């Protein structure tokens, strides 16, 4: 070979060894991914409390939050439902109590507008959960942009609401609930993350930044609470068929809320596709395979990936604006 005449045999052997080491690392990583997704089970939720222990779910009236509440009730947890619309909370509470009447599942509700960030609302939440044996907190409350929008055109109110709801709301609720968990030496804090925070996302810059903040905060909190008996996990997801995503059809990469939540609760403590992030899980297999492929091929923050992400959201914005224009003409 030509290389034999240019490079010493020892150098070629060394390069071959490095290549084999890299390939072996990728193979092992992929095997670990498959085991985490399809073979190994997650932590038993009974670890966080016996039947009748409470779970607090924010953003509980629709989508993923509603599904978390229903499935946790099915597993024997009493549920504290927190969201903005009281009528929806009352309907869900009645649905849960009727559906699981034989299990004596209890519910409590609190209607609060997280965008308002009112001290009195958080005082009510504290009064509601004080004295309850809360074993699980699901930080699901969140808001995105109405449609993809350039940052410099983002309405100030929308920008403020996203940061206040996604960041301050999550932090303040956790600060109320977590001390009791630490005192009881058991608990699970699940926070909903997003691929929008993992991948830099042009035209969703404020939302992307808020979810990236939650990633760093949750991982830091996990490090702080290690050894206390309280588990912290940020759950990464790509698209799910919810009102926020405005997607109705499921696919290999887009589950419905029921499937996504069922997988998440079954895989607590398993990293799934989030192999390079402590205290983080990407539990749904379609999302996890996508994450692994990107991290091991194109990378996450490179210009090519960012440009592709921008193109996708520019297309979504264009279609949304055309639809709004058509609807305006019909009105």
Swiss-Prot record:
GO MF annotation list: ketoreductase activity; very-long-chain 3-oxoacyl-CoA reductase activity
Gene Ontology CC terms: endoplasmic reticulum membrane
Binding, NADP(+): 56, 113, 121, 140, 207, 211, 240, 242
Membrane-crossing residue ranges in chain numbering: 11-31
UniProt superkingdom: Eukaryota
Family the UniProt entry places it in: Belongs to the short-chain dehydrogenases/reductases (SDR) family.
Database matches in Pfam families: adh_short
Protein's name according to its UniProt entry: Very-long-chain 3-oxoacyl-CoA reductase
Biological process, per Gene Ontology: fatty acid elongation; sphingolipid biosynthetic process; very long-chain fatty acid biosynthetic process
Primary location: endoplasmic reticulum
Keywords, comma-separated and alphabetical: Endoplasmic reticulum, Fatty acid biosynthesis, Fatty acid metabolism, Lipid biosynthesis, Lipid metabolism, Membrane, NADP, Oxidoreductase, Transmembrane, Transmembrane helix
Enzyme superclass (EC): oxidoreductase
Cell compartment(s), UniProt: Endoplasmic reticulum membrane
Its job: Component of the microsomal membrane bound fatty acid elongation system, which produces the 26-carbon very long-chain fatty acids (VLCFA) from palmitate. Catalyzes the reduction of the 3-ketoacyl-CoA intermediate that is formed in each cycle of fatty acid elongation. VLCFAs serve as precursors for ceramide and sphingolipids.
UniProt-listed InterPro entries: 3_ketoreductase_fungal, NAD(P)-bd_dom_sf, Sc_DH/Rdtase_CS, SDR_fam
Active site: 207 (proton donor), 211 (lowers pka of active site tyr)
Species: Botryotinia fuckeliana (strain B05.10)
EC number: 1.1.1.330
Reactions that this protein is recorded to catalyse: a very-long-chain (3R)-3-hydroxyacyl-CoA + NADP(+) = a very-long-chain 3-oxoacyl-CoA + NADPH + H(+)
Topology relative to the membrane: Single-pass membrane protein
Family annotation (CDD domains): 17beta-HSD1_like_SDR_c
Pathway the protein acts in: Lipid metabolism; fatty acid biosynthesis
């Amino acid at each position: 070979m030509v290389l034999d005449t240019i490079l010493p045999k020892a150098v070629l052997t060394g390069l071959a060894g490095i290549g084999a080491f890299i390939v072996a690392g990728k193979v092992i990583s992929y095997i670990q991914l498959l085991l985490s997704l399809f073979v190994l089970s997650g932590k038993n939720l009974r670890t966080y409390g016996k039947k009748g222990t409470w779970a607090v779910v924010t953003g509980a009236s629709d989508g993923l939050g509603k599904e978390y509440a229903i499935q946790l009730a099915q597993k024997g947890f009493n549920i504290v439902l927190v969201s903005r619309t009281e009528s929806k909370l009352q309907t869900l509470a009645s649905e849960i109590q009727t559906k699981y009447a034989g299990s004596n599942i209890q519910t409590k509700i609190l209607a609060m507008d997280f965008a308002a960030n009112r001290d009195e609302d958080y005082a009510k939440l504290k009064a509601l959960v004080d004295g309850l044996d809360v074993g699980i907190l699901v930080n699901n409350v969140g808001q995105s942009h109405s449609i993809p929008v350039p940052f410099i055109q983002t309405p100030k109110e929308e920008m403020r609401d996203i940061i206040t709801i996604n960041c301050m709301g999550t932090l303040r609720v956790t600060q109320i609930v977590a001390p009791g968990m630490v005192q009881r030496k058991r608990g699970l804090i699940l926070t909903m993350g997003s691929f929008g925070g993992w991948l830099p996302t042009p035209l969703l810059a404020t939302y992307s930044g808020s979810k990236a903040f939650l990633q760093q905060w949750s991982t830091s909190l996990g490090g702080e609470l290690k050894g206390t008996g309280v588990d912290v996990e940020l759950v990464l997801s790509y698209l799910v068929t919810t009102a926020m995503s405005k997607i109705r059809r499921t696919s290999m990469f887009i589950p419905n809320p029921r499937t996504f939540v069922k997988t998440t609760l079954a895989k607590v403590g398993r990293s799934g596709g989030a192999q390079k992030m402590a205290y983080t899980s990407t539990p749904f297999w379609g999302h996890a395979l996508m994450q692994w492929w990107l991290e091991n091929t194109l990378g996450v923050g490179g210009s090519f990936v960012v440009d592709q992400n921008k193109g996708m959201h520019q297309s979504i914005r264009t279609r949304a604006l055309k639809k709004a224009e058509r609807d305006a003409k019909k009105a």
